[in-house]
């Protein structure tokens, strides 16, 4: 069993039950899924960049991403409906905990001038979104093989009803929020 999953069952669940006075342990919020999305705008002119982005996401997450396509045509961006413009991965279960553990303990501390993640990035329904400016913070990415620095959005979806519950859950998991 994963280190974080074990910690959730043994330490975090009792702590949240006592803090929020839940009647049942089933009311305790948990991380449902993590969605990693990267937009590749250059894919319109050069399809090889999309292949590189897909390969990097596969290395980071250990799961093959889905190629996302344009919903509408936009003449200003020379974009046609249905053109591939990005990639996304949805992680659940064991892989989700592995990725979250790696994100919190290895990748985020590698960010330059890192002072913690923003507390304001909750959406009002207990989900947390975080933007990463470069994929180089992940240990799986080889610096010499990177053709272009790309960012990505990481959405952590929880079953929490409020932002306060979600913030407490992520703090217990070791998410480094700003002071």
From Swiss-Prot:
Name of protein: Large ribosomal subunit protein uL5
Pfam families hit by this protein: Ribosomal_L5 (PF00281), Ribosomal_L5_C (PF00673)
Function: This is one of the proteins that bind and probably mediate the attachment of the 5S RNA into the large ribosomal subunit, where it forms part of the central protuberance. In the 70S ribosome it contacts protein S13 of the 30S subunit (bridge B1b), connecting the 2 subunits; this bridge is implicated in subunit movement. Contacts the P site tRNA; the 5S rRNA and some of its associated proteins might help stabilize positioning of ribosome-bound tRNAs.
Key words of the record: Ribonucleoprotein, Ribosomal protein, RNA-binding, rRNA-binding, tRNA-binding
Gene Ontology CC: one annotated term: ribonucleoprotein complex
Entry's Gene Ontology BP terms: translation
Xref: PROSITE patterns: RIBOSOMAL_L5 (PS00358)
Species classification: Bacteria, Bacillati, Bacillota, Bacilli, Bacillales
A GO molecular function held by the record: structural constituent of ribosome
Subunit structure: Part of the 50S ribosomal subunit; part of the 5S rRNA/L5/L18/L25 subcomplex. Contacts the 5S rRNA and the P site tRNA. Forms a bridge to the 30S subunit in the 70S ribosome.
Family according to the record: Belongs to the universal ribosomal protein uL5 family.
Entry keyword Ribonucleoprotein: yes
